Amino acid sequence: MASRKEGTGSTATSSGSAGGAVGKGKGKGGSGDSAVKQVQIDGLVVLKIIKHYQEEGQGTEVVQGVLLGLVVEDRLEITNCFPFPQHTEDDADFDEVQYQMEMMRSLRHVNIDHLHVGWYQSTYYGSFVTRALLDSQFSYQHAIEESVVLIYDPIKTAQGSLSLKAYRLTPKLMEVCKEKDFSPEALKKASITFEHMFEEVPIVIKNSHLINVLMWELEKKSAVADKHELLSLASSNHLGKSLQLLMDRVDEMSQDIIKYNTYMRNTSKQQQQKHQYQQRRQQENMQRQSRGEPPLPEEDLSKLFKPHQAPARMDSLLIAGQINTYCQNIKEFTAQNLGKLFMAQALQEYNN
């Protein structure tokens, strides 16, 4: 994933300027107790995101962009967006922060909502739970509390149903990211698990009345589809690819568990050595005391037994979260196909 799109520096700069505007609009001056209960998206934004992926998304390459809108009480209204342009690392003259500011300034001149309220990203078979996404969303949410990230799945959408979800970091994870302490003890103290990292926010897509009337007319004019078309099974390629990605993440989790178990064994071994050293030291001092000799001076055990560095556990949580996402996708895929098989069987028995 390109650093320009998910680098915390550029995101924080542009979000910070938008954050003050959002605070003004709410009249709170950036209160910390507000929460987003719902995300309302204009149909234009959805079409722009889909069009952006169709024009620039290829294979595993993701597309990203900025979401614009405003906050109304506990509802985040996304009214417009613009994409990040595709460019290579050789484009040293490109300034992504300047690009964002110029785009928002241009939108303001034509009286379009220009407040920065989040960002969007496409995903490849649900592969979006990454450290880069975590860092970017933390940067956005730290600057503007109501910020969300929209995840668009083009593969699911191509199968006939729009897949667009909004996520935010949970308050617990925000506190851990602020402290930047991802040690096992810190995560255990904060009660952070992969299930408590992201929270999904309900999405409502809103269209104007004229667009709703047009869609109603188009639906009336559209050709009647085969009544049995909905019973067609989805392609097995999706299931195979999801299983392959799931196995890759399980392998990564296995390697991470091995590293953590090695750390625990080394720590336990060092504790035993420290305990044995203290016992020997105590026995030697007792012998010296019986001979009337002064005890040996105390030594700094931290210098003799340097503690092992605990591995950071955030990557493990992200891998576990991604595994959970793959499992949910596979569950949805198989449930739909099994339902179609049972319906097809019932229809066949009825016709016979």
Curated annotation (Swiss-Prot):
UniProtKB keywords: Cytoplasm, Initiation factor, Isopeptide bond, Phosphoprotein, Protein biosynthesis, Ubl conjugation
Region (Disordered) location: 1-34, 268-301
Compartments where located: Cytoplasm
Annotated Gene Ontology cellular component terms: eukaryotic 43S preinitiation complex; eukaryotic 48S preinitiation complex; eukaryotic translation initiation factor 3 complex; eukaryotic translation initiation factor 3 complex, eIF3m
Residues with Phosphoserine modification: S3, S183, S191
Principal subcellular localization: cytoplasm
Gene Ontology annotations of biological process type: formation of cytoplasmic translation initiation complex; negative regulation of proteasomal ubiquitin-dependent protein catabolic process; translational initiation
Full protein name: Eukaryotic translation initiation factor 3 subunit H
Native source organism of the sequence: Mus musculus
Phylogenetic lineage: Eukaryota, Metazoa, Chordata, Craniata, Vertebrata
